[in-house]
């Protein structure tokens, strides 16, 4: 009987405890109060399910984005939820167990709070609208390892004291308006591996970074001056858009103390004493040089003079026996005195052999010609008197790729007239070229910023590699020109222009892409990327996936243009990083480095364009809708919201299930974390299944430009 009463009592206690848990909550009271205040500061957004402005139980009720350990809140992750308002920060320091706070990619603004959770290890406030200076309160978060304030509206001098933040490994202040020199306390960041300061207005030198264990540094597009410390030259460094000195660094001014721990410090005392002793010895050691020393100098001069005379007599005698052909036979390499025309001998074209001229006997020398740096430019004065050894290129371009002259391309493009200008991209302008035989091609003039004039051999090698790409959805390279310092590539021409023009031009005609055609374009582009990523060996990272580089033929089949160009141009990464059109993956914006996964992200953005008809970044829209990814991503799994974001040009004519599955593929491709993005082969499979199901329940009404020409648009075209 007693045992039964014990069981009843225990059961009663459990019930009472359970009820008390709901009365008092499972969450620490101070944590709950802090989250209530934060919720109010963000205007009580509906997307934060379970959250309340008063009381509640964040841990017990599973508030969205909140992670707990026991009764304490340890993580808050609310990235990309279109949150607005401020941080309501006067209670944040109560979250003493919080180790991660991620509010990135929202519309939060105002100044940063005066106090932050004291034990944060990761703080991400990137891609918001925060203003003012970076709060000094960040100086007190000593456990901090990751801090990202990039893509905000901060300005002025950085007010943070970094002397206590020696655990910090990643720091991102990029794309703000910070000014003045870097804080001296940067030198205390002894664990810092990655630093992103690009696109600000910092000035002064970067000497304070010299002693840090950095592996990645991006300081592009600031006002830095001075010299790059030698310790930074062996890391991943992006520094364009500054005014750094390119010459050797000057020696330290007189009186500058030597670097701590350097050998010169150890010997300095002895040198100083020697100098002092010589001064104290008086005039006896300043009066002159001894007789023995004078005799030694005279004998040395006589020996050197005799050797010089003998050398010149020998050279003169030998030069009389030399014929002009002796010079040409040296090392079996032809060379000549250069005129104003520079002839280059490439094995890819038999007609481009080097002219060999006989040298005048009076100018003949029998010295082995020095190797010529192909990157070196010769001015007119040098080129009229110095022999130039021309390097032979051993790269062979496929025979079906034609070598054009500049004159040929000038005639075909009307001297590269504006009337024939098709577009302008990151690496140069593209012109329509019509040849005498009626053939129409597209000619791209590669800017010298992308490929300097002296790098013709590199250009030939690049052409050879791109010419070997062979896929029906990759624009074919059919010719090239390397003449007079110009580098041009010639592609097949597609009269319907680019996908960008179809989607974003105001003319009604450009809005006629029906749903099936959009899926067809997505699938064809995916197959092109699958070829580059998984068929080519080694894999090719395109780096420049965007709607402007997807050309459409008369049947609206997509052709990926400029494929491989960015992978082989030496300055491609730097040029691409200077312009962010909304296609760049988050990791590219942070590090400037491209990968197969960043290509997949960019492809996801193109799919969003096909879905919504919007540009990846549109400054004419409201702030919350300027970034297509940030605006669209939270709505991709909500069928009602999805229907509202579809391109109005479709006029509601699309299969709802097809639309939903299309959105699912997009969501996978634009995952913030690259490891969660699928390989292109899986993307292709998903789109193929989408097409197959569309064939069974086809619901497409509309007229494509191809249909106006008399050809029917059928889903079988993109099977």
From Swiss-Prot:
Residues 248-257 have a biased composition (Pro residues). One of its GO terms (cellular component) is membrane. Expressed in seedlings, roots, stems, leaves, flowers and siliques. The chain crosses the membrane at residues 294-314. Disruption phenotype: No visible phenotype. Residues 30-293 are extracellular. The modification Phosphoserine is found at residue 377. LRR repeats lie at residues 97-118, 119-140, 143-164, 167-190, 191-213, 214-234. Residues 315-719 are cytoplasmic. SMART domains: LRR_TYP. It is a single-pass membrane protein. Residues 1-29 form the signal peptide. PROSITE patterns: PROTEIN_KINASE_ATP (PS00107), PROTEIN_KINASE_DOM (PS50011). InterPro entries: Kinase-like_dom_sf (IPR011009), Leu-rich_rpt (IPR001611), Leu-rich_rpt_typical-subtyp (IPR003591), LRR_dom_sf (IPR032675), LRR_N_plant-typ (IPR013210), PRK1-6/SRF4-like (IPR046959), Prot_kinase_dom (IPR000719), Protein_kinase_ATP_BS (IPR017441). Residues 416-690 form the Protein kinase domain. Pfam families: LRR_1, LRR_6, LRR_8, LRRNT_2, PK_Tyr_Ser-Thr. Its main location: membrane. Keywords: ATP-binding, Leucine-rich repeat, Membrane, Nucleotide-binding, Phosphoprotein, Receptor, Repeat, Signal, Transmembrane, Transmembrane helix. One of its GO terms (molecular function) is ATP binding. The keyword ATP-binding applies. PANTHER family: LEUCINE-RICH REPEAT RECEPTOR-LIKE PROTEIN KINASE PXC1 (PTHR48007), PROTEIN STRUBBELIG-RECEPTOR FAMILY 4 (PTHR48007:SF13). The protein kinase domain is predicted to be catalytically inactive. Belongs to the protein kinase superfamily. Ser/Thr protein kinase family. This is Protein STRUBBELIG-RECEPTOR FAMILY 6. It comes from Arabidopsis thaliana. The gene is SRF6.
């Amino acid at each position: 009987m007693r045992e039964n009463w014990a069981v009843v009592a225990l059961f009663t206690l459990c019930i009472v405890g359970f009820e008390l848990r709901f009365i008092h909550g499972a969450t620490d009271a101070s944590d709950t109060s802090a989250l209530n205040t934060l919720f109010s500061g963000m205007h009580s957004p509906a997307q934060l399910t379970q959250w309340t402005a008063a009381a509640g139980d964040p841990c017990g009720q599973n508030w969205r984005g909140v992670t707990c350990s026991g009764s304490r809140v340890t993580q808050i992750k609310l990235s990309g939820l279109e949150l607005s308002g401020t941080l309501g920060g006067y209670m944040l320091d109560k979250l003493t167990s919080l180790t991660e706070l991620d509010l990135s990619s929202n519309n939060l603004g105002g100044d940063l709070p005066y106090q932050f959770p004291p034990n944060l290890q990761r703080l991400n406030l990137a891609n918001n609208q925060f203003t003012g200076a970076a709060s000094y309160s960040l100086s007190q978060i000593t456990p901090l390892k990751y801090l990202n304030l990039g893509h905000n509206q901060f300005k002025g001098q950085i007010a943070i004291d970094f002397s206590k933040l020696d655990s910090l490994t990643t720091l991102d202040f990029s794309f703000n308006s910070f000014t003045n020199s870097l804080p001296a306390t940067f030198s205390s960041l002894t664990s810092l591996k990655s630093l992103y300061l690009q696109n600000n207005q910092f000035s002064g030198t970067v000497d304070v970074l010299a002693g840090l264990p950095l592996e990645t540094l991006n300081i592009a597009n600031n006002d830095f001056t001075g010299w790059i410390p030698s310790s930074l030259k062996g890391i991943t460094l992006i520094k364009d858009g500054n005014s750094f000195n390119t010459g050797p660094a000057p020696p330290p001014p007189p009186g500058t103390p030597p670097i701590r721990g350097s050998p010169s410090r150890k010997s300095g005392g002895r040198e100083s004493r020697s100098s002092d002793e010589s001064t104290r010895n008086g005039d006896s050691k300043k009066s002159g040089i001894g007789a023995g020393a004078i005799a030694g100098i005279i004998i040395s001069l006589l020996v050197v003079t005799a050797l010089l005379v003998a050398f010149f007599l020998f050279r003169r005698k030998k030069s009389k026996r030399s014929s002009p052909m002796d010079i040409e036979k040296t090392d079996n390499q032809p060379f000549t005195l250069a005129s104003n025309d520079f002839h280059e001998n490439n094995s890819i074209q038999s007609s481009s052999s080097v002219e060999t001229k006989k040298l005048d006997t009076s100018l003949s020398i029998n010295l082995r010609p020095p190797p010529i740096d192909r990157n070196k430019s010769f001015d007119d004065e040098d080129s009229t008197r110095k022999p130039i050894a021309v390097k032979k290129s051993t790269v062979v371009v496929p025979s079906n790729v034609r070598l054009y002259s500049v004159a040929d391309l000038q005639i075909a493009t009307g001297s590269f007239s504006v009337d024939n200008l098709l577009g302008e991209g990151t690496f140069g302008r593209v012109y329509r070229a019509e040849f005498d035989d009626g053939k129409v091609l597209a000619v791209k003039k590669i800017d010298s910023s992308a490929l300097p004039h002296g790098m013709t051999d590199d250009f030939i090698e690049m052409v050879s590699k791109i010419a070997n790409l062979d896929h029906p959805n990759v624009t074919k390279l059919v010719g090239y020109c390397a003449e007079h310092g110009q580098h041009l590539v010639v592609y097949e021409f597609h009269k319907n222009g680019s996908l960008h023009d179809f989607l974003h031009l105001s003319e009604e005609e450009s809005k006629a892409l029906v749903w099936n055609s959009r899926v067809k374009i997505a699938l064809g582009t995916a197959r092109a990327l699958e070829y580059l990523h998984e068929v080519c060996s080694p894999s090719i990272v395109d780096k420049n996936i965007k709607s402007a580089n997807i050309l459409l033929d008369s049947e609206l089949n997509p052709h990926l243009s400029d494929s491989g160009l960015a992978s082989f141009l030496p300055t491609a990464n730097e040029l691409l990083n200077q312009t962010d059109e909304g296609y760049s993956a988050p990791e590219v914006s942070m590090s400037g480095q491209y990968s197969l996964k960043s290509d997949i992200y960019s492809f996801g953005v193109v799919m969003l364009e096909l879905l919504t008809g919007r540009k990846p970044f549109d400054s004419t829209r409201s702030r919350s809708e300027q970034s297509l990814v940030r605006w669209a991503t939270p709505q991709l799994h909500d069928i009602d919201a999805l229907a509202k974001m579809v391109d109005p040009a479709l006029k509601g004519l699309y299969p709802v299930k097809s639309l939903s599955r299309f959105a699912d593929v997009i969501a996978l491709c634009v995952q913030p974390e690259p490891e969660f993005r699928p390989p292109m082969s899986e993307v292709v499979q998903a789109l193929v299944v989408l097409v197959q199901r569309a064939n069974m329940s086809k619901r497409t009404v509309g007229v494509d430009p191809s249909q106006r020409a008399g050809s029917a648009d059928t889903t079988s075209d993109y099977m």
